[in-house]
Amino acid sequence: MADTNPIKQFEVHEVFPFEAFGLNLAFTNSSYFMVLTTVLTIVLFMVAMSSRALVPNRAQSVAEIIYGFVADMVRSTAGQEGLRFFPFVFTLFIFILVANMLGMFPYFPAPGAHSFTITSHLIVTVALAMLVWLTVIIYGVFKNGFGFLKLFVPSGVPIFVLPLVVVIEIISFVSRPLSHSVRLFANMLAGHILLKVFAGFVVTLAAAWGGFGYLAGIAPLAMAVSLTALEFLVAFLQAYVFAMLTCIYLNDALHPGH
């Protein structure tokens, strides 16, 4: 019978074992899907934009729509000045979106013959969130100097509560990588577990009850199909939310004064 353990899909397996200087540097299924996500994204956009026709074909139209969508998001959130970060935000959005979508396919030409959702691992989302956080700090200090500290001193706050507000602002800023990463990780993890659980119901009922089990499995199968459609939407929304929050945080580096 098929393995219905909902957690097994998140296991990291070594594909090519490698060790150097006492460190395990093995190429894993997680590494494979990171590379695949990067290569697939580059290839798709190269193919889509190869013609650069005045009247775009479907692939070019999709690429231009995505480009415009992200550009509008950056402009509306971080202002015209924020467009200097467009390549950064666009790369994050596309990488997360493609990674999320790849994880939606149960079987894939990959090690172990099944897909792997890299954004369902906290270490990956934390790395992405830390990249954003450090970018905000480095650019904010570089552009504003000590003026970057205005971020922690909101204007118009009464002096007698200002110390408390400053502490709250600092805690909020320091905790950004955690909230930024956990939101993406938790949504992708929970969604894939639910899909696996309902799909497992169908397999278990069919194996245990035979023909009657197939009839009993119609309800969980319908739920699994509905959840799959919802999960595709969540995959897009989580990429959008991560990119949107990135724009908001970058706006703090550009304009630290409240």
From Swiss-Prot:
List localization entries.
Cell inner membrane
Keywords, A to Z?
Answer: ATP synthesis, Cell inner membrane, Cell membrane, CF(0), Hydrogen ion transport, Ion transport, Membrane, Transmembrane, Transmembrane helix, Transport
Task: Provide the membrane topology annotation.
Answer: Multi-pass membrane protein
Annotated transmembrane regions: 30-50, 85-105, 122-142, 151-171, 198-218, 230-250
Q: Where is it predominantly found? A: membrane
Q: Which InterPro entries match?
A: ATP_synth_F0_asu, ATP_synth_F0_asu_AS, ATP_synth_F0_asu_bact/mt, F0_ATP_A_sf
Q: Which domain of life is it from?
A: Bacteria
Give GO cellular component annotations, separated by semicolons.
plasma membrane; proton-transporting ATP synthase complex
> Is NADP one of the keywords?
no
Give one GO molecular function term. Answer: proton-transporting ATP synthase activity, rotational mechanism
Q: Where is the signal peptide?
A: none
Family annotation (PANTHER family): ATP SYNTHASE SUBUNIT A
Protein family membership: Belongs to the ATPase A chain family.
What is the recorded function of this protein according to its Swiss-Prot or TrEMBL entry?
Key component of the proton channel; it plays a direct role in the translocation of protons across the membrane.
Describe the subunit structure. Answer: F-type ATPases have 2 components, CF(1) - the catalytic core - and CF(0) - the membrane proton channel. CF(1) has five subunits: alpha(3), beta(3), gamma(1), delta(1), epsilon(1). CF(0) has three main subunits: a(1), b(2) and c(9-12). The alpha and beta chains form an alternating ring which encloses part of the gamma chain. CF(1) is attached to CF(0) by a central stalk formed by the gamma and epsilon chains, while a peripheral stalk is formed by the delta and b chains.
**Official protein name in the record:** ATP synthase subunit a
The opening ranks of the lineage are:
Bacteria, Pseudomonadati, Pseudomonadota, Alphaproteobacteria, Maricaulales
By which gene is this protein encoded?
Answer: atpB
